[in-house]
């Protein structure tokens, strides 16, 4: 399973990249907003430049989301994003217009990610429209007392049934168990906040064992 980092923070991306486990990046307007110090002066060019900087850090897919709602505007914006770097993947929301944009962009050879997916029906439509990736949001489903990981399992099964090549990106990950369950289900990718990536490496028995080893290492002459 591939690991993407779900952030627009350059320091977090660099830190994750230094671990040697990073395969790509996902961003969205909310994540971009978190890193903007002065929203009043942040321009479209600033946004495009930021995506370019991410592409310079990570040698893998960098997902950037459109900020328009009608199909024609999404296509136009998607073409602009794709022109930034060969690694850019254009995220489009799973709406009727989003499906039209995904189809059009895919026909132009531009990779797409159908985002804000919350049902198997939406995921099937995304694959049929030509999306390279589909992003079910598990945490947001959990928030409304629905089993988000069950949706991932359904999508993986449906895609396997018909040999659909759309890759499943498990999104809205909240904790390490989401990552484990994604791997067990057979999802292609988990996109993970940096805080959760760090949690994946932690275990109290590792800490206890290391403490004991270091105490015992005192007998080794320096």
UniProtKB/Swiss-Prot annotation:
Under Enzyme Commission nomenclature, its number is: 2.2.1.2
Compartments, as annotated in UniProt: Cytoplasm
Alphabetized, the UniProt keywords read: Cytoplasm, Pentose shunt, Schiff base, Transferase
Show the GO MF annotations: aldehyde-lyase activity; transaldolase activity
Q: Where is the active site?
A: 91
Q: Which domain of life is it from?
A: Bacteria
HAMAP family xref list: Transaldolase_3b (MF_00494)
UniProt family annotation: Belongs to the transaldolase family. Type 3B subfamily.
State the name under which the record lists this protein: Probable transaldolase
Q: Which organism is it from?
A: Chlorobium luteolum (strain DSM 273 / BCRC 81028 / 2530)
